[in-house]
Regions:
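Flexible "arm" and connector segments at domain edges
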Residues: 1-72, 76-121
Length: 121
């Protein structure tokens, strides 16, 4: 199941892969409440990294400077676990969510003067 690591994964494939991994290596899913706590921890790690990268604080040491992609992948893994636990098809949910945003915000952001780029910036 892990052989072709260079192939692009669809969301559906990723959900199946995560389920396989949990059943094979994790024994079972953590409870939803535990996964919620783990998700908050992982989002906190992303926030801490981005704060150090773009905010006023520097990294305390070089070992602390983790790759953003790895931290975001941790978030996606836990979100996928929660989706699997609740029978949510992430591909369908994301498409429906994007359709909703497109319908709702079709002109809202374009007309927002705060988002317009000023010349010279």
């Amino acid at each position: 199941m892990f052989e072709n690591r260079n192939a692009e994964l669809s969301l559906k494939q990723y959900q199946k892969l995560v389920d396989y991994w949990v059943q094979s290596y994790g024994v079972r899913y953590f409870s939803e409440l535990t996964n919620l706590g783990v998700l908050m921890e992982e989002v906190g790690e992303v926030a801490r990294l981005l704060t150090r990268m773009h905010g006023d604080q520097s990294f305390k040491d070089r070992n602390e400077e983790k790759e953003l992609g790895d931290e975001l992948a941790d978030v996606l893994f836990v979100v996928t676990c929660l989706a699997n636990q609740h029978g949510v098809d992430l591909a369908r949910a994301l498409q429906e969510n994007l359709d909703k945003k497109t319908s709702r915000d079709a002109e809202r952001h374009i007309k927002n003067p705060k988002l317009r780029r000023e010349s010279g910036k």
